[in-house]
Curated annotation (Swiss-Prot):
Its EC number is 3.1.-.-. Changing H86A: 5% exoribonuclease activity. InterPro entries: Metallo-B-lactamas, RibonucZ/Hydroxyglut_hydro, RMMBL, RNase_J, RNase_J_2, RNase_J_arc, RNase_J_b_CASP, RNase_J_CS. The gene is rnj. Homodimer. It is found in: Cytoplasm. It comes from Pyrococcus abyssi (strain GE5 / Orsay). Substrate binds at H384, V385, S386, G387, H388. Changing H388A: 1% exoribonuclease activity. This is Ribonuclease J. The keyword Metal-binding applies.
Length: 451
């Protein structure tokens, strides 16, 4: 009698009903590799009295702020792999890694150092897991049957990876988050050669983000964002006194562009905000950003002192601040509330970031813009390109890898279904080769047959 063995199980623990709290686990022959441990930030921000670092994983799970990892809690976990350094992928490491004490955590150098920063701030759990910086192209054997590999890809944070879990049944490829940037201003490139090799070697399952798959285009290069910024800041008609730019603190390429623009304008770039200090500090350690001519303000005293100087000679500075989503406590939000700096008609605020599409962010950004408008501030919006793959990026990845099965991830249900529709266009059948899952469910992938 024939029976199916060597089944691969995909535990879809977080990020399969929302954009956030990403966590997936891959089981083969009783051994598990976890990929990502993220948070859902809006579920933390919506409660004013929540102190994330001091809370238990149980309480945060009830808030819907971190993934529910109970389906794999008693499994034999052999490794934790982190795809990149965004908080919706690493923000819960301090809360969830302690459930798997001493299990090694792997990622690229920038990702691991950001994870260490998160762990350092953890106040509820002690984290004993060793963390290892892994280079692109290195294949790490984590058990007799399983190995992991980080393949270079482009996204809106340095050293992002497509994570590959090698099994005797073929590769499980985790592509959350990515885009194909062929003209990155600072030389980052997708490793097309390795992706094509994987396709030839045999990809069993592709787990792919679906955030922007409904957009019928290819996501533009970061070079386009650089051009948009230069086109605004460096044209002859620029008459602004005070210039304030805001973008994602982790978007190191964008921050580098702003430093270079400030230098060309004869202005000093000044970074203000704790998260900007953290991300640029670690990037500088690794040689990922050149801070020439700029300053980073860390202490509240330095911020208030320097902003007094800036207000007397606004034309000499480009302020780069936190707060593009209108987050409470961020620098731009505080300025709009009349704190720190007398922002007004002499100032121009440049938003080099889109609005994250959840109701809390939309509401907070609306409140921020309204306050700035009431103060007479000029606003320039959408000098930005996304870091997420659009439909044609996804189509190319499917064709390169030629996976047997596809599990859409990293999105609300409607996003996952849009990905499934693309897979159908590429010849896959929903329910047979494409599986739409939910948080807490398991997708069972048939293994080889032996008698």
């Amino acid at each position: 009698m024939w029976e199916e063995i060597n089944m691969i199980k995909i535990y879809t623990l977080g990020g399969y009903e929302e954009v956030g709290k990403n966590m997936t686990a891959v089981e083969y022959n009783g051994e598990v590799v976890i990929v990502d441990m993220g948070i859902r930030l809006d579920r933390v921000l919506i409660h004013e009295d929540v102190e994330f670092q001091k809370m238990s994983s149980k309480d945060l799970r009830k808030l819907g702020a971190i993934p529910d990892d109970r389906p794999i809690r008693n499994k034999k976990v052999v490794a934790i792999a982190l795809s990149h350094g965004h908080l919706d992928h690493i923000g819960a490491v301090g809360k969830l890694a302690p459930h798997y004490p001493d299990v090694p955590i792997y990622g690229t150098p920038y990702t691991i150092r950001l994870a260490k920063s998160e762990i350092k701030g953890e106040e509820y759990f002690e984290v004993t897991n060793p963390l290892y910086e892994t280079n692109y192209g290195e294949i790490v054997q984590v058990s007799e049957n399983l190995a992991i590999e980080f393949v270079q890809i482009t996204h809106s944070i340095p050293q992002s990876s497509i994570v590959v879990i090698h099994t005797p049944e073929g590769a499980v490829v985790y592509a959350c988050d990515y885009k194909f940037d062929n003209n990155h201003p600072y030389g980052e490139r997708p490793d097309y050669k390795r992706l094509k090799e994987l396709g030839k070697e045999g990809v069993k399952v592709l787990i792919a983000e679906s955030t922007r798959v409904a957009e019928e285009t290819k996501t533009p290069s970061e070079a386009v964002a650089k051009m948009l910024l230069e086109d605004f800041f460096l044209y002859e008609g620029m008459e602004a006194d005070g210039l304030i730019a805001t973008t994602f603190a982790s978007h190191i390429a964008r921050l580098q562009e702003l430093i270079e623009i400030a230098n060309k304008m004869g202005r000093q770039a000044i970074f203000i905000g704790r998260s900007l200090a953290k991300y640029t500090g670690i990037a500088k350690q690794l040689g990922l950003i050149k801070m020439k001519g700029s300053r980073v303000l860390r202490s509240p005293n330095a911020v208030s002192k320097v902003l007094k100087e800036v207000s007397q000679a606004r034309e000499n500075y480009l302020l780069i601040v936190t707060g593009h989503q209108g987050e409470p406590g961020a620098i731009l939000t505080r300025m709009a509330n009349g704190e720190l700096y007398d922002i007004g008609p002499r100032d121009t605020v440049v938003f080099s970031a889109g609005v994250i599409p959840n109701p809390l962010n939309v509401a907070q950004r609306y409140a921020l813009e309204t306050k700035l408008r009431m103060k007479g501030v000029r606003m320039i919006k959408n000098l930005h390109v996304s870091g997420h793959a659009s439909k044609e990026d996804h189509r190319y990845l499917i064709r390169m890898l030629n996976p047997e099965y596809i599990v859409p991830a990293h999105g609300e249900f409607r996003m996952l279904t849009h990905y499934a529709e693309l897979a159908e266009e590429e010849g896959y059948m929903i329910g047979k080769e494409v599986f739409i899952s939910r948080n807490g469910h398991v997708v069972e992938i048939p293994g080889s047959l032996e008698g």
